[in-house]
Amino acid sequence: MKKQPINYPIFTFRWLAIHGLAVPTVFFFGAITAMQFIQR
């Protein structure tokens, strides 16, 4: 095996960090788009 136990936690932390930032960002953009659409 290619030393998977050492590389796996880094991949998991990176995956959690990306999703932890991407999910609120998409929700934030969706809220702004909805607000501007309702204002018009």
Curated annotation (Swiss-Prot):
UniProt keywords, alphabetically: Chloroplast, Electron transport, Heme, Iron, Membrane, Metal-binding, Photosynthesis, Photosystem II, Plastid, Thylakoid, Transmembrane, Transmembrane helix, Transport
Location within or outside the cell: Plastid, Chloroplast thylakoid membrane
Binding site for heme: 19
Residues passing through the membrane, by range: 15-31
Entry's Gene Ontology cellular component terms: chloroplast thylakoid membrane; photosystem II reaction center
Keyword Iron part of the UniProt annotation: yes
Reported cofactor(s): heme b
Gene Ontology MF annotations: electron transfer activity; heme binding; iron ion binding
Entry-linked InterPro entries: PSII_cyt_b559_bsu, PSII_cyt_b559_CS, PSII_cyt_b559_N
Pfam families: Cytochrom_B559 (PF00283)
The keyword Heme is annotated on this UniProt entry: yes
Protein's membrane topology: Single-pass membrane protein
Function: This b-type cytochrome is tightly associated with the reaction center of photosystem II (PSII). PSII is a light-driven water:plastoquinone oxidoreductase that uses light energy to abstract electrons from H(2)O, generating O(2) and a proton gradient subsequently used for ATP formation. It consists of a core antenna complex that captures photons, and an electron transfer chain that converts photonic excitation into a charge separation.
UniProt xrefs under HAMAP family: PSII_PsbF (MF_00643)
Summary of subunit composition and partner proteins: Heterodimer of an alpha subunit and a beta subunit. PSII is composed of 1 copy each of membrane proteins PsbA, PsbB, PsbC, PsbD, PsbE, PsbF, PsbH, PsbI, PsbJ, PsbK, PsbL, PsbM, PsbT, PsbX, PsbY, PsbZ, Psb30/Ycf12, at least 3 peripheral proteins of the oxygen-evolving complex and a large number of cofactors. It forms dimeric complexes.
Family statement: Belongs to the PsbE/PsbF family.
Protein name, per record: Cytochrome b559 subunit beta
Native organism: Cyanidioschyzon merolae (strain NIES-3377 / 10D)
